[in-house]
Amino acid sequence: MGIKQHNGNTKADRLAELKIRSPSIQLIKFGAIGLNAILFSPLLIAADTGSQYGTNITINDGDRITGDTADPSGNLYGVMTPAGNTPGNINLGNDVTVNVNDASGYAKGIIIQGKNSSLTANRLTVDVVGQTSAIGINLIGDYTHADLGTGSTIKSNDDGIIIGHSSTLTATQFTIENSNGIGLTINDYGTSVDLGSGSKIKTDGSTGVYIGGLNGNNANGAARFTATDLTIDVQGYSAMGINVQKNSVVDLGTNSSIKTSGDNAHGLWSFGQVSANALTVDVTGAAANGVEVRGGTTTIGADSHISSAQGGGLVTSGSDATINFSGTAAQRNSIFSGGSYGASAQTATAVINMQNTDITVDRNGSLALGLWALSGGRITGDSLAITGAAGARGIYAMTNSQIDLTSDLVIDMSTPDQMAIATQHDDGYAASRINASGRMLINGSVLSKGGLINLDMHPGSVWTGSSLSDNVNGGKLDVAMNNSVWNVTSNSNLDTLALSHSTVDFASHGSTAGTFTTLNVENLSGNSTFIMRADVVGEGNGVKPWA
């Protein structure tokens, strides 16, 4: 400490300048009494140390560990506990750094091998680089527990963290940055990871999170992964955001986001149980689906948004695969697809249930489907809005599938000639079914080709388009309209048209002058108004209502 006194004043009644040259000195108070107000605390200096091995390891705050010792396989490590039944107790304090750079082998950051071991740290940094491979943290021992506190970071040029054998890991505001390997791997029955709030996983070349309760003792229960406000950002071919295998439970809390940017890199791929609210999924690669469920149930709540630039939005395909995608009136969900479909159920026990959801499909003029059920799949929707660009079809069912829609339904195709609702006949399959009941605003045509379509239009419905029923395979098209309007745009036929205080308008959107629009109905009932263009003034431009 140096004290500079001005004007030759050597008394301690004036402290003009105090220069503190040691971090161990804390200035509490300036005053005329001089130096008795200065508190001296013990000096703690961060130390550099080499690899740590043993069952009880305690590292001081701020220390730096550099891997300089090889394990029996000849690979450098930072911290390691012995294998076996002796528990390890590893306390890495606050702000400790573990660096391992193995220029010729497998770099290992922290390896916990003993049964019932514990690892404790806060604001830990692990940075590993290996020539052949690398792992930031590997919890190998049975029933190990790791608490990484707040703000810890794992960096690796291969795998980030691997945990298994019914072990647990907790952290918050946690960061994993890695390349080539998986960011976080959760193996075995009973293994669980809770990343708290605000954690981030960024990988280049592989999957962000893999979880699978596929081995070990099933009495320990499912493998579990929990986080909220989680960000996953992955790049690379087939690099999925989250890969959920059987016997796994994932809870993504609220405001989590998943982004992938590789071909076939699905945002969420699941055989397990997944839940999330206000989830955002954005995938940009070719054939990359936003959410693909192959088994189990995935439940996604309000204010969730799925976007797939070149693939499907939601898809179920597999045994008892279910997606519940539920927005609310105040917080609607959305799906955008620049690929094949917005939502698709593709096998006999595959189901998608949606509420309060807006679906947009735009494949730049190529075929795309808003809702697509096939091979016995089923889709239900309540209060849906579907927008289809040129080349798209709104709702489509084939190969013995079913779609059921209730409440408000909006289908807005780019022209009335495009298919808003349609079924397809396929030899050897029972007729597919599409049922809709509620207030409908439909811009597009309805075509029953070897299928059964039943539309029950509630008051305020408006349909602009044409209809077709080919009656193949027992197919039918039945429409009931109550205080609704059908603007017929071209020649149409259907099996049943039941009208109550409604209007069928051939004039406003019909064929051009000089041509006729024909409507064939097998069973017509009710009391409503037909508006037709008639040649009552000599030039074919007269419009006359018929009751």
UniProtKB/Swiss-Prot annotation:
InterPro entries: Autotransporter_pectin_lyase_C, Pectin_lyase_fold/virulence, Pertactin_central. SUPFAM superfamilies: Pectin lyase-like. It comes from the Bacteria. Transmembrane segments: none annotated. To B.pertussis prn N-terminal region. This is Putative uncharacterized protein YcgV. It comes from Escherichia coli O157:H7.
